[in-house]
Design a protein with these regions (language model features):
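Bacterial Sec-dependent N-terminal signal peptides
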Residues: 1-22
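Intrinsically disordered, low-complexity segments enriched in polar/charged small residues
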Residues: 8-9, 111, 161
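Intrinsically disordered and other compositionally biased segments
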Residues: 12-15, 54, 161
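Generic domain-boundary/flexible-linker signal
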Residues: 16, 112-114, 199
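Acidic/His- and Gly-rich active-site-bordering loop/insert found
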Residues: 22-156, 165, 175-183
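Acidic/histidine-rich catalytic neighborhood of metal-dependent amide-processing enzymes
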Residues: 146-213
Length: 213
């Protein structure tokens, strides 16, 4: 299930970013060769508490995610507005591109009651099948481990909404590793208060409107 979800997202993402048939082949190859790394990176991202009211950890998430994209050649910055969690903003300019794509994601998650979780909500656990279907915990995969598409990774925000972040990162990795590159300019706009009602989103947009034009 993990591989299937990530792969489907990567196909959609690479098709939008690159718009070339060979981008799908590049994505397939990247997932096949790097599935173990994708899962481990995803688990690490999920281990960072991201409740919107937890200002310290939210900023830790923002800096970490921003740095991941910076390492991949994006110009990154944290957009600040008074009393608000930062927006993770990034740009990747493609020479000759005639269009710009903006990806919106939120990196905060819903508040949690740890007593209602089998494992800690920010302690990602990999299962060999659906937990309710009799699945059992297994170690994170090594480099030579074959990735089973039925594996499940349980954690807060595993679906909503950190999965798109790891998907975009690996779409970028797949395209860059294959030398295909992008056909569009890319902008990133990742919010840190969506689960809290996006109370400061309009203020962010108004203050930083020039970046989004």
């Amino acid at each position: 299930m993990i591989q299937r979800i990530i792969f489907t997202g990567l196909i959609l993402c690479t098709s939008v970013i690159a718009g070339q048939p060979q981008s799908v082949k590049a994505t397939r190859k990247w997932v096949k060769n790097n599935g173990h790394t994708i899962i481990k990176d995803f688990a690490h991202l999920l281990s960072m508490p991201n409740v919107a009211s937890d200002k310290l950890n939210i900023r830790r998430n923002a800096k970490y995610i921003s740095n991941l994209f910076k390492k991949r050649g994006f110009d990154m910055q944290l957009l600040e507005t008074e009393d608000a969690n930062p927006i993770i903003y990034g740009e990747y300019k493609t020479p000759g591109a005639k269009r710009t794509l903006c990806f919106y994601v939120h990196y905060d998650g819903q508040p949690v009651d740890s007593n209602q979780w089998t494992h800690g909500p920010f302690e990602p656990v990999l299962y060999d099948a659906e937990m309710d279907g009799g699945g059992n915990p297994i170690p994170l995969p090594g480099k030579r481990t074959k990735i089973d598409p039925e594996w499940r990774l349980y954690s807060r925000s595993a679906g909503d909404d950190k999965a798109p972040i790891i998907t975009i990162l690996n779409a970028v990795d797949g395209l860059q590793s294959s030398k295909i590159g992008f056909t569009s300019n890319i902008k990133l706009f990742f919010e840190g208060e969506e689960e809290a009602g996006s109370t400061n989103l309009q203020a962010h947009i108004t203050k930083h409107k020039a970046l989004l034009d």
